[in-house]
Amino acid sequence: MNESPDPTDLAGVIIELGPNDSPQTSEFKGATEEAPAKESPHTSEFKGAARVSPISESVLARLSKFEVEDAENVASYDSKIKKIVHSIVSSFAFGLFGVFLVLLDVTLILADLIFTDSKLYIPLEYRSISLAIALFFLMDVLLRVFVERRQQYFSDLFNILDTAIIVILLLVDVVYIFFDIKLLRNIPRWTHLLRLLRLIILLRIFHLFHQKRQLEKLIRRRVSENKRRYTRDGFDLDLTYVTERIIAMSFPSSGRQSFYRNPIKEVVRFLDKKHRNHYRVYNLCSERAYDPKHFHNRVVRIMIDDHNVPTLHQMVVFTKEVNEWMAQDLENIVAIHCKGGTDRTGTMVCAFLIASEICSTAKESLYYFGERRTDKTHSEKFQGVKTPSQKRYVAYFAQVKHLYNWNLPPRRILFIKHFIIYSIPRYVRDLKIQIEMEKKVVFSTISLGKCSVLDNITTDKILIDVFDGLPLYDDVKVQFFYSNLPTYYDNCSFYFWLHTSFIENNRLYLPKNELDNLHKQKARRIYPSDFAVEILFGEKMTSSDVVAGSD
């Protein structure tokens, strides 16, 4: 079994906690590696706390089972020659060239019809070009049959029709080249045949439509990169069976977006054919939707912003709801999607893998999802959960399942006393921090009188004292803005999510690779390797503040 393509992405969640361990310990693994001791005085408390556990045999066995099935699906590419041919016929350039040839062929035929009516004839060279184009597409069909196998290729009705049209048009071109059409027109019984030939020529328009369809498939494959696709039984969808009953896929689209994403009609056809009356679709996008009637009103929408996390409450409700749906019938399945079908989808799928005890730890679930979603036959690029906060929330949910019996933890109300930013670049100016809770901005450093900033030049460290004892609880988002640094997702320099119930010792330390946006390759050149953010909290201890977690 190959390792996950991007193991560093799992750094924040590979700690397996025992019943007596703190649920927050996993968040500090990176601190022991990244932060200098003199800059993070509490780091030493967490050294040695991390215990890396191997992936369980049951998870590896489940992955191996899927690998055998996937190997059967790609058995047609088992030789070097077939791999080379497949890479050629499935390339974007090859598909674009095919569309160009069809347009050229249609142009020649229209010219032929116009000049024929004028008692003139297209030169033999032009007709030879048309014949060469027909031979090219015949070769294209033969190569695709060679790669995909005859039974699979001709399981698609459009492929059957296109092949028939190519053969007919090839015969028409042969007739035009090797017979004297002018002589045949003087024979009355051939008149109707010639008219029929002209009509058959117009079938090239259908061939153009089919080539456009092939080009759309190539564009969708390019957009989905090396995400594992479903390419059986005439389907070609950005869709992966994570387990036999859990499907992860990209957004079912219509209109122009269906040109490069899963067409919603094809997704409906797939689910109705494979799991009729036994599927439920979960749309995790807050930014886009579709008419649930497409899926017979079996759609549940969970509002999660792109590149952000679900609330812990949403994760608990989702996993319990899916578990109940699965228990109703052994044939019931769920199809889960966001926009691309990796980060938000992966976060929720990983939560259910833990809830259903397919995986026992956050590390296992993240590894498992990444292995299933990534098609390594095309590229080693990791297609699992990559955003640090999303991985952090999978780790939170693992504690919810194991330490809190699948219920929300008791609510902790905290307030921020200090922000400490380590190894800040010297050219950085105009720092702004913004805190959101329950979709509302509850704090901003731009407000006068709420904080003071101390810039320590000798240690490249910024200390921000917060005067406003604003109570924070449950899911909290912290954003950082620099006026002279690039902005990425969420229109900020970087950000992260935390849940107050999992903060230990009133301290949270996050190195660069656990800050959202800064985990991206393009941000690594700007921020030093030991860049980090630390937050020191105080706690509200009054009886009115200590309340149970929301349900």
UniProtKB/Swiss-Prot annotation:
UniProt keyword terms in alphabetical order: Hydrolase, Membrane, Protein phosphatase, Transmembrane, Transmembrane helix
Organ and tissue specificity: Exclusively expressed in testis.
Coiled coil (residue ranges): none
Pfam families per record: Ion_trans, PTEN_C2, Tc-R-P
SMART domains to which the protein is assigned, alphabetical: PTEN_C2
Membrane found in the keyword field: yes
Keyword match Transmembrane helix: yes
Coarse class of the protein's main subcellular location: membrane
Region of interest: Disordered: 1-47
Ranges where the Phosphatase tensin-type domain occurs: 228-404
EC number(s) stated in the UniProt entry for this protein: 3.1.3.48
Biased composition (Basic and acidic residues): 30-45
GO biological process, one term: protein dephosphorylation
Catalysed conversion reaction: O-phospho-L-tyrosyl-[protein] + H2O = L-tyrosyl-[protein] + phosphate
Ranges annotated as spanning the membrane: 91-111, 128-148, 164-184
InterPro entries: C2_domain_sf (IPR035892), Dual-spec_lipid-protein_phosph (IPR051281), Ion_trans_dom (IPR005821), Prot-tyrosine_phosphatase-like (IPR029021), PTP_VSP_TPTE (IPR045102), Tensin_C2-dom (IPR014020), Tensin_phosphatase (IPR029023), Tyr_Pase_AS (IPR016130)
Molecular-function GO terms, alphabetical: monoatomic ion channel activity; phosphatidylinositol-3,4,5-trisphosphate 3-phosphatase activity; protein tyrosine phosphatase activity
Active-site residues, record numbering mapped to chain: 338
Effect of residue 144 to Q: In a breast cancer sample; somatic mutation
Domain C2 tensin-type: 411-540
Location within or outside the cell: Membrane
Record's bilayer topology term: Multi-pass membrane protein
Cited function: Could be involved in signal transduction.
Protein name, UniProt field: Putative tyrosine-protein phosphatase TPTE
Organism: Homo sapiens
Encoding gene (name): TPTE
